[in-house]
Amino acid sequence: MAGAAGPGTVPGAAGGDGDDSLYPIAVLIDELRNEDVQLRLNSIKKLSTIALALGVERTRTELLPFLTDTIYDEDEVLLALAEQLGNFTGLVGGPDFAHCLLPPLESLATVEETVVRDKAVESLRQISQEHTPVALEAHFVPLVKRLASGDWFTSRTSACGLFSVCYPRASNAVKAEIRQHFRSLCSDDTPMVRRAAASKLGEFAKVLELDSVKTEIVPLFTNLASDEQDSVRLLAVEACVSIAQLLSQDDLEALVMPTLRQAAEDKSWRVRYMVADKFSELQKAVGPKIALSDLIPAFQSLLRDCEAEVRAAAAHKVRELCENLPTEGRETVIMNQILPYIKELVSDTNQHVKSALASVIMGLSTVLGKENTIEHLLPLFLAQLKDECPEVRLNIISNLDCVNEVIGIRQLSQSLLPAIVELAEDAKWRVRLAIIEYMPLLAGQLGVEFFDEKLNSLCMAWLVDHVYAIREAATNNLMKLVQKFGTEWAQNTIVPKVLVMANDPNYLHRMTTLFCINALSEACGKEITTKQMLPIVLKMAGDQVANVRFNVAKSLQKIGPILDTNALQGEVKPVLQKLGQDEDMDVKYFAQEAISVLALA
């Protein structure tokens, strides 16, 4: 395989003298054309190794032409190739030769598979930065023009992602050409191309001169926002955020707001959804004055939209919208123009809408302050705590800390309790799991007395749940509670209840005792572990069930480091030695492992 390889021929790695040190490279090169996809993929991923071995000149003259001609491979291989080439500038001789990487990437930017094209565009964008301004106009801009005027829509969609990276460093004449190409793609016959152009409109606007934004980008935005395809119109809404940031208030009001108002009332729910989804960014981009005059009315209609998806997206933005309002007059705007709509959503027919609102409504308490929260928000929180949908109740409980800062949790505690109990016993185990995870937070806010009186029994009940994930989470929960309430509380309240389970007829519950001891020993410290927990663990070493016995060995290994030498040598060692002779293989294995780890051999 020595000598120069023409396009389509695999470049040879080993020279005529049969240098053995290059043999692995020869293998990698052979694998580039192997029938096995996995081998080709493996070789492509090591392309930089091949290039290093060949040197910069042979990489340019042999490897790259070969790669350019093999663009008919499996998508997975092409994706890897597109990614590799983005980091190849140093391997072809540096920025002066970066243009050598353009032909294979240009081919990759036209293939059918979207992920490959996107990766090729990403690599081209990377390489564009490594071109000098002269090389950019000589090599990169012509590539963009070729893609932009290609016969296949695939090449034209790829071009859309390249305009913004080459525009800033181009000469004025070339800039005009680039803008012209972008304009024509915005009105392309193929919806996929118009979609690609719309998705890059905001990015392109940011690198243009202000005059061009007004005279060219805004008309393109207006056209795309009234495109016959809703998938194009919704992308224009996204671009509006970037465009709005570039214009003065007067220009915004005259040039952009009529189109945005129209989008908020679009006949397609997907476009209205996009307006709702981008609402906070739009609010910041247009500024407080226009937000009050134009966006608040639009937001009101989105909160009452006939489509639940749109109402849910708008509900998600309620807190951010209120926080972003200017502090002067904010309370009045929220109370008069937003709160009446929120009250309606609390009893919405759709649970996703109610759930979305429940995830943010608590945050309004910090914006509205103590009096308004007690008078206006508290009734809404209480209504949501009684909602038939568990996700709604859960979202309220998981955001309690917001309210606690403003009014204290006692106001809610009477209604909280039934909601917590219901969730704790919900038929869906994932709901039970979620409430367990909030228990340490709740405990900290409600205080130890309230917790002991109302919630302690729940936490103990979870330890014997029929789902293992719940029992496991309940064990971790106990450890966090001990860290919050201290060892004395653990000794008096938790440890006795846990240890009683060691005599439970169900072996799974007996094992839970061991898991709890593992979790609690560190938090409870040496004295409680030695005096209260260790005797129970040692007693359980004689359990009839092998699973319990090997968990005894694991528990002794876990709590061993906390115990003093006397307890280890006098009590733990004999029990582990006995378990080390057990008839069950697993028990024997874990006992011997514990002896080894605790250095008791």
UniProtKB/Swiss-Prot annotation:
User: PTM N-acetylalanine: at which residues?
Assistant: 2
Q: Look up keyword Repeat and say if it applies.
A: yes
A Pfam family that the UniProt record links to this protein? HEAT
Q: Report the transmembrane regions from the record.
A: none
HEAT repeat boundaries on the chain: 20-58, 59-96, 97-135, 136-173, 174-212, 213-251, 252-290, 291-333, 334-372, 373-411, 412-450, 451-489, 490-528, 529-567, 568-601
Q: Name one GO biological process term.
A: apoptotic process involved in morphogenesis
What are the record keywords, sorted? Acetylation, Repeat
Q: Among its keywords, does the record have Acetylation?
A: yes
Gene Ontology molecular function: any one = protein phosphatase regulator activity
Give GO cellular component annotations, separated by semicolons: cytoplasm; cytosol; glutamatergic synapse; membrane raft; nucleus; protein phosphatase type 2A complex; synapse
What does the record's free text say on domains? Each HEAT repeat appears to consist of two alpha helices joined by a hydrophilic region, the intrarepeat loop. The repeat units may be arranged laterally to form a rod-like structure.
Q: Which PANTHER family match?
A: SERINE/THREONINE-PROTEIN PHOSPHATASE PP2A 65 KDA REGULATORY SUBUNIT (PTHR10648), SERINE_THREONINE-PROTEIN PHOSPHATASE 2A 65 KDA REGULATORY SUBUNIT A BETA ISOFORM (PTHR10648:SF9)
Record's subunit section: PP2A consists of a common heterodimeric core enzyme, composed of a 36 kDa catalytic subunit (subunit C) and a 65 kDa constant regulatory subunit (PR65 or subunit A), that associates with a variety of regulatory subunits. Proteins that associate with the core dimer include three families of regulatory subunits B (the R2/B/PR55/B55, R3/B''/PR72/PR130/PR59 and R5/B'/B56 families), the 48 kDa variable regulatory subunit, viral proteins, and cell signaling molecules. Interacts with IPO9. Interacts with SGO1. Interacts with RAF1.
Tell me, in a sentence or two, what this protein's role is: The PR65 subunit of protein phosphatase 2A serves as a scaffolding molecule to coordinate the assembly of the catalytic subunit and a variable regulatory B subunit.
The family annotation for this protein states:
Belongs to the phosphatase 2A regulatory subunit A family.
Please identify the protein, giving its name as recorded. Answer: Serine/threonine-protein phosphatase 2A 65 kDa regulatory subunit A beta isoform
